Amino acid sequence: MTKATPRRRRWRIGELAGATGVTVRTLHHYEHTGLLAASERTDGGHRMYDRESIQRVHQIRALRELGFSLQEIRRAMDGRTSLTDLLRKHLQRIEVQVARATQLRDRLRNMTTDGDVRVSVDQLPAALDAMSKVEKRPQPRPCTCALAADREERWRRIRNDLRHCMDRNEHPCSDRTKAVALEARTLISEIAGNDLTGSTILKVLARLSDPRSLAGWDPHLMQYLDSALVALGDQPH
């Protein structure tokens, strides 16, 4: 006597949700987008799913966790798109997102690491806008060692001259102090462009510059230069 072939197990949609860790609503959405189909229906019209359905849901979840859209997942699972090509394109998107996240991290770090600088809500848009302008500027060709060394030397000289003015209690509006500030503004413009002014320039420059070139630039000296730059006003470069 031939034994009856055992009936393959089937799961109702609620059971499938419990077995795969997704909600019934999500499974309905997968069906609506063509990602999932019931293996059969009961006489009462209830959807039933098999082991292949469970495997497919796990595959969909894995691709979703990688950040793919449902449309991309459907093309890959239907064989219309190479999964390898899809992964490569997704990797490019992730790299862009990582770069943006890194910029955001640096902005937040720049605005919070200096305990002597208080960023108010009113200053926040200007600070973020200034940083964004610097980030969006076309990247210059790498400067030669001679040019880099010259800028570092000029920056050190400006720092020393400005420190001398401050130690002598010269007012930031004095001719000597403004002359040094003008040299500083010229150098800052070479690095950050002419569209940034005042204290925002200093905050951005202080964060973007090589820390070694900022040795000796304590908050008091930076504030002194800030005041001198304000005193320059619209004086031509």
UniProtKB/Swiss-Prot annotation:
GO terms for biological process: nitrogen fixation. GO terms for molecular function: DNA binding; DNA-binding transcription factor activity. Keywords: DNA-binding, Nitrogen fixation, Nodulation. The keyword DNA-binding applies. SMART domains: HTH_MERR. Residues 10-79 form the HTH merR-type domain. PROSITE patterns: HTH_MERR_1, HTH_MERR_2. Residues 13-32 bind DNA. It comes from the Bacteria. Involved in genotype-specific nodulation of soybeans. This is Nodulation protein NolA. It comes from Bradyrhizobium sp. (strain NC92).
